[in-house]
Design a protein with these regions (language model features):
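Short helix-capping/linker segments at secondary-structure and domain boundaries
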Residues: 79-84, 198, 309-315, 335-347
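Structural motif
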Residues: 58-67, 178-181, 318-327
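Polybasic low-complexity intrinsically disordered regions
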Residues: 67, 78, 84, 88-91, ...
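Basic, short loop/linker segments at the boundary and entry of helix-turn-helix/winged-helix-like folds
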Residues: 27-79
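Helix-centered, glycine/charged polyanion-binding patches within enzymatic domains
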Residues: 224, 230-321, 325
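Charged, often Cys/His-bearing segments associated with DNA-binding zinc-finger transcription factors
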Residues: 1-47, 342-346, 350
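Short, well-ordered loop/turn and helix-capping segments at boundaries between secondary-structure elements
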Residues: 92, 123, 224, 304, ...
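A short glycine/small-residue-enriched secondary-structure motif
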Residues: 44-54, 61-69, 87-98, 104-113
Length: 350
């Protein structure tokens, strides 16, 4: 069995709790990331890794405890640090060492150890399993019913420079256009429950592939109301969507901006009672579109956490698989955060 961490720290770590309280009052971003990594998500990943992780090293460098490596990996992903940056962070910050169960008297975790554990996560597809586990926990808690969902995609930028050894860009990335702006990189397509924000479906693809082509990979067939933006117009007629065994599904797709301009111009050209009736009709449609957007906006919060709070607006590695594995881990952490908010008792207001 794996040895347990007894919690005993060195004299250099005695003041860690005091420093932690001071930094928490000053809104330290890294301390906030540690506070979000609760024991439940750490234990879930430990249980997934335990049957596959080596327990004892017969020769060579002594093995690193599984709990320590899980904490280091999740903290590294949450802070969007490279392997070398994470090694330096553990060496210089006693609060991080205390969180990761690493004492100053022990050997520091090297960047190669962090690298190998990340490859271990990618090889066994543990990030996908962690996301599926969070979805099942949310379904048990009643936070994810798959009835009212929203789907969308977002760009993850990649380096467009060719000043490297191969004199070429990443062959798995591509260029895509949005709002007259070109982006080089990949896209993360997700589907989430509109009520709780729990993400249950993800697909990674190059940036030049349209969002509508991956909608069939996100839906399960249990959905009853699907909220989409104007880029998904006509999705119900596609062959891959018709093959999904929906029981009774309704599509709520946003109207194109050009339709709004046309209706406004027509209503402005008419006067009298007819013009007033057209204006009222346009206002009713505006309210309907606003209602659909208010439901669809729940999926935008996941992109806010992915790209701004977790800082994953640019890819870390070459290729889709490694970057998608990192995004899956972040989506699983976001699901745990949303599930805690869902299960928390409502705050009383005076």
């Amino acid at each position: 069995m794996e040895e347990l961490f007894n919690g005993q720290l060195s004299f250099a770590d005695i003041e860690a709790e005091q420093f932690l309280q001071i930094r928490r009052t000053h809104a330290d971003r890294r301390v906030n990331a540690m506070d979000r990594l609760t024991d439940d998500v750490i234990n879930e990943l430990i249980q997934l890794c335990l049957p596959l992780y080596h327990i004892k090293a017969n020769h060579g460098r002594p093995y690193t405890r599984l709990e320590t490596m899980v904490r280091v990996h999740l903290l590294q992903v949450s802070l969007n640090l490279s392997d070398l940056e994470m090694e330096s962070y553990l060496a210089s910050d006693m609060v991080a060492r205390s969180f990761c169960r690493v004492s100053s008297t022990h050997q520091f975790i090297s960047d190669s150890t962090i690298l190998r554990f990340r490859h271990f996560i990618e090889q066994h597809r543990l990030a996908q399993k962690l996301l599926e586990r969070t979805v099942s926990l949310a379904a048990e808690a009643g936070a994810c019913s798959f009835e009212m969902v929203a789907a969308d995609g977002t760009f993850i930028e990649a380096p467009s420079s060719t000043k490297n050894k191969a004199h070429a860009r990443d062959p798995e990335m591509a260029s895509g256009k949005k709002a007259n702006t070109w982006h080089f990189g990949m896209k993360e397509h997700i589907a989430a429950c509109s009520e709780s924000g729990i993400i249950y479906g993800t697909v990674a693809a190059p940036a030049n592939e349209h969002d509508i082509t991956h909608l069939g990979d996100l839906l399960k067939g249990l959905e009853k109301m699907v909220f989409l933006d104007s880029g998904y117009i006509g999705c119900a007629k596609r062959a891959e969507i018709q093959e999904i065994p929906f029981k009774d599904v309704s599509w709520y797709i946003a109207a194109k901006p050009s339709a709004w301009k046309k209706e406004l111009s027509i209503s402005e050209n008419f006067g009298g009672e007819l013009g007033q009736a057209l204006v009222e009709c346009v206002n009713v449609k505006r309210q309907l579109e606003h209602a659909k957007a208010s439901v669809r906006c729940s999926i935008e919060w996941s992109f806010l956490w992915l790209k701004r709070i977790y800082g994953y607006a640019k890819v870390r590695y070459r290729g889709l698989a490694k970057n998608h594995s990192r995004a899956l881990t972040l989506f699983a952490l976001y699901n745990c955060y949303r599930l805690r908010k869902w299960c928390a008792p409502p705050e009383l207001s005076c």
